[in-house]
Each structure stands twice: as structure tokens, then as C-alpha cells.
């Protein structure tokens, strides 16, 4: 397949202003393509695309569904609509879930491949009546989180960090999308600790929330103000 296919170039140019030459790769094991007007990433023997209209996401944002842990951790006792910075957009599930609660999101994704997949699903969501208003709550930016923290002039009610957990195995229980995301966009704990450090120093928020494996060390060695614990992970909440 020619990764410089005009359909791919046209599709990317229609959903984002990023330069397509920066994205398209001549690598045989990693390339973008369009299938039924959906932008997809082929990576080795796997396929990745993002769909905010999936049954999983729709169930997650259903008002009758119990608030998930990320919502509880970010909102706390607040009843207000918040301005939130998601420093690690990834597959966008937490961003979209928080936006569905009426919050405004600036969502950062440094990997250009994942970024355009997110831009594509946001563009599709804006064409769906019941998702349009949610998608319009999200500003997606292709940038490294540390760079954004160091240069942005605005502040937020909450800054959220969801570092990918180290993969212990490649079992079938690990979803294919997470396997691909981990392989191409993983940051180690040192990088994530530096991010939390920069957030604290920047004074751009009074609250930071970090998602961690249940038994993992604290990022930046800093004990949180409070925690919300689940079976396999926890949310460390910092009042700054």
C-alpha cells in the first residue's frame, strides 16, 4: 500500500491543520489508511482506530451509569463545570467522559499518529446529534505535555495525568488498542514524574489527578493529598 495515497492526505487535511508530511511514514509496519471514511492505523499485525460512538463509550457517558472513578477523582465535591487539562489523551476515553459531564477539556497528545486518529473521531462525533455538544467541549492539541505546561498562559481547575502502565505481558486480556498505544507512545515513570513536577512548579492549577497502578510508587515521590482506590488502579489527588 502506498501510504501517500491521496485519500489519506485529503482525509487528514480535512480534519486537522497538521502537516501531512509529518505524519505519513514509509515504514511497512506502520501506516495510516482510510476505510469507510474512518482513519485507521496499521501497526505490525494490528489495526487501531478510535470511535466515540462505540457501545463502550456510550455506556460510559450514559447519565444513568454510575460515575466512573476518573469522574469522581477529578470532580471531587465540586458541582461546577470545570476547565480541565488532560495531559495524556491517549485513546481519548477519559477526555470524552469528562466532556460528557459538561466540563471543558484541553486534551494533549504528542504522538502524531494517535493525534490524527483522535482528530478523526472527534470530527465524526461532531456529525452525530447526541455527541456533537460533547465533542465541541474538547480542544485537541498535538504537543508534548511538558512543552505545553511551560509555554501556556492559561490556568485550569484540574490537570489530569494518565500515564500508561508498564505492560507485564501481551496476553489476550490486554486490548489491542492499548497494545498499539503502549508500543508507539509509552512514557516511563521518570518522564511522568517530570511532568508532575512541572505542573506543581507552574502553579497553573490548584488540583492535579494522577492515575497509577494500585501498588505503584508515587510520581515524583510526592505523597498525594487524598486517594481514590479501585481493584487494580488508584487516583492520586494533589491539592496544590
UniProtKB/Swiss-Prot annotation:
It comes from the Bacteria. GO terms for molecular function: rRNA (guanine-N2-)-methyltransferase activity. It catalyses: guanosine(1516) in 16S rRNA + S-adenosyl-L-methionine = N(2)-methylguanosine(1516) in 16S rRNA + S-adenosyl-L-homocysteine + H(+). It is an enzyme of class 2 (transferase). InterPro entries: 16SrRNA_methylTrfase_J, SAM-dependent_MTases_sf. Its main location: cytoplasm. Specifically methylates the guanosine in position 1516 of 16S rRNA. Belongs to the methyltransferase superfamily. RsmJ family. HAMAP family: 16SrRNA_methyltr_J. This is Ribosomal RNA small subunit methyltransferase J.
Amino acid at each position: 500500500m502506498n501510504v501517500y495515497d491521496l485519500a489519506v492526505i485529503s482525509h487528514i487535511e480535512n480534519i486537522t491543520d497538521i502537516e501531512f508530511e509529518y505524519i505519513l511514514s514509509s515504514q511497512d509496519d506502520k501506516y495510516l489508511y482510510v476505510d469507510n471514511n474512518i482513519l485507521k492505523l496499521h501497526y505490525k499485525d494490528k489495526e487501531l482506530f478510535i470511535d466515540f460512538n462505540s457501545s463502550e463509550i456510550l455506556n460510559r457517558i450514559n447519565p444513568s451509569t454510575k460515575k466512573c472513578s476518573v469522574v469522581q477523582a477529578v470532580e471531587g465535591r465540586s458541582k461546577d463545570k470545570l476547565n480541565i487539562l488532560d495531559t495524556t489523551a491517549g485513546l481519548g476515553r477519559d477526555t470524552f467522559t469528562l466532556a460528557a459531564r459538561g466540563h471543558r477539556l484541553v486534551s494533549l497528545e504528542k504522538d502524531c499518529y494517535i493525534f490524527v486518529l483522535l482528530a478523526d473521531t472527534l470530527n465524526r462525533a461532531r456529525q452525530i446529534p447526541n455527541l456533537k455538544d460533547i465533542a465541541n467541549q474538547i480542544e485537541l492539541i498535538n504537543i508534548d505535555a511538558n512543552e505545553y505546561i511551560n509555554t501556556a498562559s492559561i490556568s485550569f481547575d484540574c490537570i489530569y495525568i494518565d500515564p500508561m502502565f508498564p505492560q507485564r505481558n501481551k496476553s489476550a486480556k490486554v486490548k489491542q488498542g492499548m497494545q498499539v498505544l503502549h508500543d508507539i507512545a509509552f512514557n516511563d515513570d521518570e518522564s511522568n514524574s517530570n511532568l508532575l513536577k512541572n505542573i506543581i512548579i507552574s502553579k497553573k492549577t490548584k488540583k492535579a489527578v494522577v492515575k497509577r497502578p494500585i501498588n505503584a510508587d508515587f510520581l515524583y515521590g510526592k505523597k498525594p493529598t487524598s486517594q481514590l482506590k479501585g481493584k487494580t488502579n488508584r487516583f492520586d489527588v494533589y491539592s496544590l
